[in-house]
C-alpha cells in the first residue's frame, strides 16, 4: 500500500475514533461530579459531603485513596456508599448513579480540599473539585442572648425557588439584629420577617431590627444562587445561615451559625434528571 494512502487511513481512523466514541464520556466513561459540589461550612471536627458518580454498569467499586489541598495534615477520610435503596443498581436514563459519601475528621482550624483520588473499578481516578471544599471549625459562643429555635438543616437544591424556608430565633435579652445572610454561594430571596408571628417587612426593609427580651423572630425566605455563578439545580451545596446580632451590654457582635446541607438527589426522579443533564 502506498505510504501516503496508509497514513491517510490512519488519520481517518483516528478522527473517527475521536469523534464517534473515544471521547464520549456519556457512554464509555465514569463521571464523578467534582464540579457540582459547593462546600464552605463552619462546623465541628467531624464533617462529611457527597459526590455523585455515574457509570454505564451497575455494581461500581469505589475505594478512597487520598486527597490534596491545604492544611490536610492529620485529616482522616473514609468512603461510604450513600446511595438510596430505590436507586441502587437501578438503570436510569441508560446509566447507574452512585452517591459517594465521605466522612471526615480534622483537628485543624480549617481544611481546604482541592482533589480526591479514588480507585474506581480498579482504575485510579483523580477527581478535581472545581470549587475547593473549605471546612472551618466553629468557635464556641459565650453569649446566648439570642438563640436559634428552628432552621432547615437538610433541603434539596431543586426546591430553592419554590420553598419558603423558616429560620426561627428567640431573644432572651434586648438586642439589635444586624444582618441575616448565607456565608457563601447563595442568597435569601423574597424574604418576610415576623416578630411574634406578625409580619414586619422584608430583610432589606427592617434590618437592622431591634427586638425585646421574650420576642420570637422568624425569617421566611426562598434561596437562590448568587448572580453570575455557574450552578445547577442538581448541585450539592453545603453552607451556613448566619444571624449577626448585638446584645445590650456587649461590646461586640455575636453570630448564630447553622449548617445547611442541600442535596442534589433525593429520589429516582432526581437521579434520572441529573443523568440526563450530564448527557
Predicted regions and their residues:
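Surface-exposed beta-loop interaction hotspot
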Residues: 119-199
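Bacterial N-terminal signal peptides that target proteins for export
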Residues: 2-8
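Bacterial signal peptide processing site
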Residues: 23-25
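Aromatic sugar-binding surface patches on proteins
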Residues: 88-102, 213-224
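C-terminal motif of bacterial Sec signal peptides marking the signal peptidase cleavage site
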Residues: 18-21
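Short, solvent-exposed loop/turn segments enriched in Ser/Thr/Gly
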Residues: 44-49, 107-115, 161-164, 236-239
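Surface-exposed binding patches on compact interaction domains or structured appendages
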Residues: 47, 51, 57-96
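Extracytoplasmic/luminal low-complexity segments enriched in Pro/Gly and acidic/polar residues
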Residues: 195-279
Amino acid at each position: 500500500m502506498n505510504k501516503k494512502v496508509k497514513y491517510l487511513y490512519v488519520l481517518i481512523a483516528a478522527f473517527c475514533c475521536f469523534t464517534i466514541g473515544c471521547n464520549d464520556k456519556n457512554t464509555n466513561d465514569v463521571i464523578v461530579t467534582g464540579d457540582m459540589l459547593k462546600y464552605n461550612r463552619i462546623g465541628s471536627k467531624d464533617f462529611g459531603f457527597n459526590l455523585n458518580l455515574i457509570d454505564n454498569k451497575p455494581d461500581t467499586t469505589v475505594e478512597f485513596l487520598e486527597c490534596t489541598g491545604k492544611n490536610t495534615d492529620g485529616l482522616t477520610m473514609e468512603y461510604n456508599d450513600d446511595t438510596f435503596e430505590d436507586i441502587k443498581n437501578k438503570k436510569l436514563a441508560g446509566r447507574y448513579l452512585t452517591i459517594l459519601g465521605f466522612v471526615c475528621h480534622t483537628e485543624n482550624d480549617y481544611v481546604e480540599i482541592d482533589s480526591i483520588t479514588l480507585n474506581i473499578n480498579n482504575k485510579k481516578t483523580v477527581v478535581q473539585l472545581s470549587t475547593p471544599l473549605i471546612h472551618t471549625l466553629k468557635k464556641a459562643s459565650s453569649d446566648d442572648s439570642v438563640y436559634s429555635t428552628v432552621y432547615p438543616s437538610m433541603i434539596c437544591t431543586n426546591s430553592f425557588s419554590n420553598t419558603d424556608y423558616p429560620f426561627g430565633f428567640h431573644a432572651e435579652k434586648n438586642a439589635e439584629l444586624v444582618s441575616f445572610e448565607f456565608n457563601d454561594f447563595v442568597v435569601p430571596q423574597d424574604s418576610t420577617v415576623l416578630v411574634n408571628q406578625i409580619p414586619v417587612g422584608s430583610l432589606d426593609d427592617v434590618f437592622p431590627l431591634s427586638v425585646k427580651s421574650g420576642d420570637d423572630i422568624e425569617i421566611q425566605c426562598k434561596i437562590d444562587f448568587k448572580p453570575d455563578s455557574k450552578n445547577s439545580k442538581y448541585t450539592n451545596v453545603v453552607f451556613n445561615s448566619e444571624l449577626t446580632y448585638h446584645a445590650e451590654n456587649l461590646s461586640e457582635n455575636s453570630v448564630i451559625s447553622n449548617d445547611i446541607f442541600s442535596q442534589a438527589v433525593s429520589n429516582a426522579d432526581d437521579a434520572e434528571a441529573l443523568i440526563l443533564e450530564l448527557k
